[in-house]
Each structure stands twice: as C-alpha cells, then as structure tokens.
C-alpha cells in the first residue's frame, strides 16, 4: 500500500477513481440530488439510517468510500506540504477540514451499522474510525485523544491479525485472501499506528509508562474513555477474546530479567515478561502432572508465541545502537528457543510413551507398526537435540554441550533398541543381537555421571534414567544371544534337503519322506552300472521256494514226489541211467 501511494499524484489519481465509483454507487441507491440549490436540505446521504443499511449493505459501503475519499484528499494535501511551504497555513486548514469530513462519515457509518450481526465487520469499521480520529488528534496536537484512538486501533488490529492467523485447513483461494489481510494489517500497524502511538506517548505528559512495548501501552490506554463513541469495539473484542484487550495488572510484579545458564538478560517488553512468568511458573502450568502429549501443546504454543513477540521486537529494534540491549535480546532469544525446543522434546517423548503402552498387548504385526512410529519420532527428537546444540552460546558452555552430546547418544541408543526389538519380532535374531551388542559397547565406556548438568528443562532425561537403561542392556544382549543361537540351530535343520539321497543323516520315517527319495528335477545323467555275475546269481534263477507256500506243504509235496519217482524207476526196467548233470554215467 505504501509503495502504491507515495506521491500527491498517486493520491490524486486514487481519489478520482473513488469519485467515479461513488457516483455510480449513488445512482444505484438513488442518492443523486440534481437540484443543488439549498443542497444541505435536499441531499440524501446524511439521511441514511440503520434501516437502510439493514436492507442493503451498499449504504454502508457508500459512507466508507466517502470517508476514504476525504482521507485521500487530506493525504494528498499533506504530501504537497512536504514538498513546498507555499500557503502552508491555508493548506493545513484544508487538510484538517478534510480529515474532519472523513471522520464525520466514519461516525455516520458506525451509527447505521449498529445492527450488523457480523462482529468482525463492526470491528473493522471501528478500527477505520479510530485511525481517522487518531490522525485528526495528532494534527490538532490532542495527544491524550491520539493515545486513546491509536491504542484502540492497535488492539483491534492485533486482534484481527490473530484471528486471521488462527485460520487452518482453508482452501487455496481463501489462503491467498487471508495472507493479503495479514499483510495489510501488518503494514498499517508498522507504518501508521506504531509510529503515531509512539509519538503520542512521547508528547502526552500523563502517559508515563515503564515500558517501550507498544502492545502493552495500547492495552493500558485503550479504556481511557477519551473517545466514548469508540469504546464499544473494546467490549466486542473482550466478548470474543478477553486476553486481546486485557491489561497486565499494576499489582503484578513483573520479572525484570531472565537467567540462562551463567547469563542474565534484561527484559524490555512487559508483555514478554508477563508471559514468561506464566510459562515458567510450575505451579500454574502444572506440567509435572501432564501424562498426555496434547497437554504440552499449550506450553508449546506459549513458547512459540513468545518467540514471535520477541522476534518482532528485535526486528523493530534492529538498528539499536546500545550494545548491551542488543546482547540482552540475543540472550533472551536463545533462552526462548532453548525452552521451546525442550518443550517439543518432552511432547514427543510423551507420545512415544503412549505408543509403547498401546503396543504392549497387541499382535506382533501391530506392534511393528507402533515401533515404526516410535523410530520416526526418535529421529525427530535427535534432530531437535541437534538444533539445541546449534543455538548461540551452547557451544561455549562445555558442560551443557557435553551433556547435549550424551543426550543425543542416549536417544540414538533408545532408537537402536527399538529397532533391535523390531528385528526380533521379525525373527531376525542375529541382527537384533548385533544391534544390542553395538549399543552395549557404545554406552559401556560412559562415565558414572553421564550428564554434567544437574537437570534438563521439563526433565526430558536424567542420570538415573540413563543408568537404568544401561543396566538393562546386558540382560537384553543375553536374551538376544539365546534367541540367535536357537535361530541358528533351527536354520540348520531347515536348510537340510528334503531328499533322502542327499542327506545321509536323514532317515525316511513317513510317507512324505518316502516320496522324496531323490530329486529328479535336477539335470541327471543316466548310465549303466558295471557288475560281475557270480554263481549264486545263476543258481538263484533255478531255485524254487514254493511261490510263497508254507514249508510243511513243500516238505510233504517233496516227500510224495520222491516216493513216486523211486517207485516209477523201480517199475520201469527200460529207464536209462544218467550220470552227473547227464554227462557221466549214461547207460
């Protein structure tokens, strides 16, 4: 906006565009007064009522554009005065009169929109009126009114920005609109409201403040009631978000500094000091009793908000010449980031505990899914630990840096242990044994006092926890060794061939084994086996064992046959006598 409207010509062109749009809008609403004689009595714009707006919101748009046209005219004159002082007093009077006309249209707009149901739209109308009122008060050097007007404007703009910033899961087109609104609000705040508010504070003797934080000042003076017609907007905001307009009680003793390790830094922002007090008060946050990761989201968002506040404060004071203040702000930045990252660590560790408890009584496949998520979370935790080590000032603190190194080793070891248990669930016991043995060897050489510092924020780890984990490792290694040995023995049996002919130590004991005497699927070469016949082989072909008959039957038949043959031979005188094998003794 500031880049688009930078010269008197720019303001003049924009004013002409608005005049054309206003003329068209007045025709649409039938607000044209052709007879200009005695115009004040005949003109219709001043007679617009809330009922007209309730029927058609274009009546409100007409008044808003009318106020903007007069405001542009005053800015055009101001730009001319910056170039030349010719007729300065008359131009100045004209400029103030145009601001007054703009304010009059703004007040009329507030009157007719009293029944507007959209409270955010009403807040925008009041914000615009507060900006015009503040501009008029500054030009008339009415500093108390200027302080009240710009305080109201700043509270309203901060509220609108927070509402836009909280929008989530929006479509791409809405996201572009939201981003534009946030950019516009930021530019108005930085280029108009903050400089004007700072000027009003410096000029108003009654506006003594112990802080240079404009947000805190605006909350202190937004209820001054110097401009009663603007006060309803504070009540509207308070109904939606009371904290947006709540004042830090004067009875509350704010902390003046923060301590990070051996460094102490002064706080120059009351809002920052107040919110740090709330977040670091263990009795108020009660984080020690948190047993759910979602409960830590409040702390996480709190530290993130502090980081945003302090970053904006540093951006506004980036040209600070006071080296002590620059150093204090750098220490506070490290302090906030340090606690923010440890809050994230604690939240992730609680999620791991929840996943571990859920995976205790489930099947192996489901437990593997839980372990996969746990390993991923440990990867995030290790990355966060590395971010903490990279913070300014950490490397120079030997005890802290060494403790963070060991903290990273501890998380790596716990991640490896989960990985080893996952291998064991997959029956990969040798791999699990290797991992457990590696973890045991890595941590066995550690000192008795693993962490050199007394404690970490939110107690993310301790020497007692490490010693307990270290003592459990040998039993886990032994268990992995036993399972790995069983796995090796089992694999030996499983690797033996099913075919009897290929395994001399395997004997056929079932039909299944008998079916696998040999593997004929292999490429075989069949060849005759050389053999030498013996006398028994020849004689075997002539031996008759009775074809399976009983021995008594064979003996009786043999005796009967012998008797019959001898009788026949005796009765046959003509039978020839033969020798051995019919060769010798023939007659």
Curated annotation (Swiss-Prot):
One of its GO terms (biological process) is SRP-dependent cotranslational protein targeting to membrane. It comes from the Eukaryota. Pfam families: SRP68. Gene3D superfamilies: Signal recognition particle, SRP68 subunit, RNA-binding domain. GO terms for molecular function: 7S RNA binding; endoplasmic reticulum signal peptide binding; signal recognition particle binding. Residues 553-571 have a biased composition (Low complexity). Keywords: Cytoplasm, Endoplasmic reticulum, Nucleus, Ribonucleoprotein, RNA-binding, Signal recognition particle. One of its GO terms (cellular component) is endoplasmic reticulum. It is found in: Cytoplasm; Nucleus, Nucleolus; Endoplasmic reticulum. Residues 553-578 are annotated as: Disordered. Belongs to the SRP68 family. Component of the signal recognition particle (SRP) complex, a ribonucleoprotein complex that mediates the cotranslational targeting of secretory and membrane proteins to the endoplasmic reticulum (ER). The SRP complex interacts with the signal sequence in nascent secretory and membrane proteins and directs them to the membrane of the ER. The SRP complex targets the ribosome-nascent chain complex to the SRP receptor (SR), which is anchored in the ER, where SR compaction and GTPase rearrangement drive cotranslational protein translocation into the ER. Heterodimer with SRP72. SRP68-SRP72 heterodimer formation is stabilized by the presence of 7SL RNA. Component of a fungal signal recognition particle (SRP) complex that consists of a 7SL RNA molecule (scR1) and at least six protein subunits: SRP72, SRP68, SRP54, SEC65, SRP21 and SRP14. This is Signal recognition particle subunit SRP68. It comes from Debaryomyces hansenii (strain ATCC 36239 / CBS 767 / BCRC 21394 / JCM 1990 / NBRC 0083 / IGC 2968) (Yeast).
